[in-house]
UniProtKB/Swiss-Prot annotation:
UniProt entry tagged with the keyword NAD: no
Major location (coarse): membrane
Keyword Cell membrane found: yes
MF-aspect GO terms: metal ion binding; oxidoreductase activity, acting on NAD(P)H, heme protein as acceptor
InterPro entries per record: COX15/CtaA_fam, HemeA_Synthase_type2
Origin organism lineage: Bacteria, Pseudomonadati, Pseudomonadota, Alphaproteobacteria, Hyphomicrobiales
Organism for this UniProt entry: Parvibaculum lavamentivorans (strain DS-1 / DSM 13023 / NCIMB 13966)
Enzyme nomenclature, EC number: 1.17.99.9
Protein residues bound to heme: 267, 324
Protein name: Heme A synthase
Record-linked PANTHER family: CYTOCHROME C OXIDASE ASSEMBLY PROTEIN COX15, CYTOCHROME C OXIDASE ASSEMBLY PROTEIN COX15 HOMOLOG
Amino acid sequence: MNILPRINAIEKTDANHHAIAWWLIGVAALVFIMVVVGGLTRLTESGLSITEWKPVTGALPPMTEEHWQEEFDLYRQIPQYQLVNKGMSLDEFKTIYWWEWSHRFLGRLIGLAFFVPFVFFVVTRRVERALVPRLIFLFVLGGMQGVLGWWMVMSGLTDRTEVSQYRLAAHLGLATLIFGALIWTALDLLNGKSTRLLTGLAKAAAAILALIFLQTILGAFVAGIRAGLIYNTWPLMAGAFIPDGLFAMTPVWHNFFESHLTVQFQHRMTAYLLLLCVVWHWWAARKTAAAPSAGWLAVATFAQACIGIWTVLWVVPIPLGAAHQAGAMVVFGVAVWHVHRLAK
């Protein structure tokens, strides 16, 4: 029996898996960059500078001074200009416009970077039929993210001077999930498909991953209401570890999403809990094959906590705020890799 054709088929399949996996990792890297640019867009208060959603014609920026003036006139009609940026010059407007345009451009680039290779892999039969639905689902999620981004921007165009923190959290949350799904799918192709979390250690890692995602969402609420600009001391807040007034708003649930004090407090407390869980998990995994990834998760989480403290103490300077945003994605990505190692 000649086994050479079978060996060649296996080698071809492995080569295809590696090509598709690295393509997905490349798309994940673009998503990472887009999230960081999105954070910079928020930190520079640039997110409302483009007041229309034109998925196709909006791909090109203004090319003439007349077109720039038209965009500026649209911006001057919204509350953010009238109440916050009254008197802004055209040159100042161009600065914030370029941040938002770059963020949207990256979204379009990610769509092309996903769609074109996907069509190529399907047409050349390099992608297995069972993987096609998952890839289509990822593409649909990307489209939904674009719609969600515009829905978020809309919240700041009428009676607000900033976007809704609820919609901001949804926008960042979906971006984080897409980022994680791209990495997970790539790891499936590189290392063999992971289907179940069989051990207690694997289930603990999955729980930590969920906690990291929750902490990312809580961070979006901190950013959305600019809670990081006050209570700029550590480890105390308002002179106490557990400050008074955490539930001053009524109804009570509003405090968790709208109170500057409570929103920052819960982000801090969740950070402490997460750091403790990650250190405990690293200790539990130190003699297993997953020790390296558990160690990297501990290092990334500790570094992110330090950046977060530094960001608060320095009253959210733009470079540190962006680094903290990037750090959240790094921690989430490392956690996805770690869970995948344990799930095999």
